[in-house]
């Protein structure tokens, strides 16, 4: 065994312990209570992890009894319905899982019938360059223009059209969370609200949440809200601005579950994004924030110059926000999917409904 949690086989290839369910999986979860939010979170995270390992199995040519991914879904009585393959590099970026129901495993009415899960960036193997390309598209608000997302949304639409939308889950981590969020938003615009489990979703903005001085942090947020709301109000007759506001309102009934670690700068801004709304309400400026939260300053400025701006992926009206307050060892620990199936976490959850 290698010193950094790697297992070396006889051929000399290495396997991370985190890929092996019997070492790193949620072994405490011997029976799933589908009404328990912690169980639902752990299963969703495990299925996302299985997508990571499906791709690693492909890269390492692990097949049959050598494959490490199946235990991650078999443990919870799922079967692999179909992997989702990127057309650019043939990597596995997602998967559709189907819950099996037997006499020994009667499916609860709260259990998902199908879970569509998406992995994040893998820094090993031949999928890295394509994953980084998709990460850049997130920053540029262009994920919806990629062929990978087109494959993803077609898979979601297929499952909903074929099996109905009841008890269909979306799940994803990091880049995969962005993919699941965008798919969920697209479906919500058509009136289909899917249960969504979004782990460490990227929030592309200045990392204000990392400012330690609370007065400075709140002051920056208030100033940003006033400027954004002012621009939106000044451009209220602009078609693009009005369409953005209407789209935001149409999403307000969708309540995705967001799982955030405050030590993860990629996603931690969601904490301030939602808390700031309540703070603005408390000081009597809720109307300003309700207008500001629908828009980004960059998008408004592009609209003012007569340029097309795409809807920022990270702007969502409502969410069930869960923050992991447990101490993270480092950034890798704070951003990792593995934290979300651990037992004994110090979690804070709050529902934010846009009104």
Regions of interest found by a model, annotated:
Residues 172-176, 180:
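Gly/Ala-rich beta-loop-alpha elbow adjacent to hydrolase catalytic centers
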Residues 76-88:
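N-terminal cap/lid segment of alpha/beta-hydrolase-fold proteins
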Residues 2-45, 49-50, 54-62, 67-70, ...:
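Alpha/beta hydrolase fold serine-hydrolase catalytic domain that processes acyl esters and thioesters
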